[in-house]
C-alpha cells in the first residue's frame, strides 16, 4: 500500500467551495467543482490549476466517453472534454438536492437525490437529449456518493448519518439491498472503485478513507491524516491515485496506492522502516502503520515546534509545506518513532 499526500498550493487559480473531484483518463487531468465559481482542472496533481472554460459544477461529476457530466444546482450538465463547451443540460422534476453521481461507461448515469432519498437513472447516450427516470423512489436513507459496479450490474451507494449503511441498487430492476448494515462510519460522502474492484469510501466522522474488499467482507483505514471533511472522491485506475475533495479546507489531496499482484499489496513486511528527504517531501517507507513525531529545530538546536502524525503501511510523502508554519522555517527536521530516529539538515533558515 502506498499513500502519497500532496496538497494544492495557493496559486492564481485556487479551488474554492469544493465538493467533488473527478479524473479524466482521456486527458490525464483532474477536475474540481467550485460551486458558483468556474470549475478548475489540473494536469500536475494540483501544482497548478486552470479554468475549464466557463463550466460550473456544485456537486457530483463523471467523465463518460468524450463528455464531463456534472451536477449543478439540481441541473445535469454535459461539457465537451476537449472544448469545455456545454453540449447538453437536463432538469429533474421534483429534485431536492442532487448530490452524488456514477456512470456505467455506456451512456447511463445514476444520481442520488440527497434530501428525498430518490435514486435517478439518466440516459445520457446523447448528451444533448438526456432523459431522466426514477430508479428508486426512496431508499429510506440519505443517499450521497455513488459508484456503478458494472460487473455486478449495480450501483453502490454510501449514505449520510451515523453508523451509515452501504446500499446497492440493481441497474435494471431498481431492487435495493443492504451490502453493509452499519459501517461504523458517520456521514459517508464519496465512493469509488480501483482496478481490482475494491471500494474506497470517504467519511466525515471520523475524517478518513476506508477501503473495502470487493465483496465488502473486509475493511481497512488507508488514509487517516491530511483530510478535512472529505467529500467526493475519484480513483485514477491507471496510476492508482485517489483524489479527494476536502470540503473543509478547500484542498484537493492526492493519495497514491500500489497496485496488487495476485490480490496482495506489494509490501515486504520484513523490510525496516525508512524515511528520506526527497526534494520538499519527507518520504516514509514503513511495513506497518505507526505514529511518528516530527520535530523542527533551529541550527543552534532550539526547538521550534513538533507534531505527531499517523503513517500508514507503505510509502507516504509528507510535504514540508503541509507542516505548521513554525516548522517551515526549520534548519533541522528530526523524525522519531518506534523504529525510526533520523535528522535532516534543511539549510540556514534560522540562526
Segments and roles (model prediction):
Residues 13-14, 46-53, 85-91, 130-137, ...:
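A short beta-strand motif characteristic of beta-propeller blades
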Residues 14-28, 35, 53-73, 92-109, ...:
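Beta-rich, blade/repeat-based domains predominating
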Residues 38-40, 76-77, 117-119, 163-166, ...:
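Structural signal for beta-propeller blades
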Residues 43-47, 80-85, 123-128, 170-174, ...:
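Short loop/turn segments that connect beta-strands within beta-propeller blades
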Residues 78-122:
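Hydrophobic alpha-helical segments and helix pairs
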Residues 258-281, 302, 343-351:
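Residue-level detector of functionally pivotal "anchor" positions at catalytic/ligand-binding pockets or at interdomain
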Residues 297-303, 331:
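Short, glycine-anchored, charge-dense loop/turn motifs used at functional sites
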Residues 303-326, 340:
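Glycine-centered tight-turn motifs at strand-turn-strand junctions
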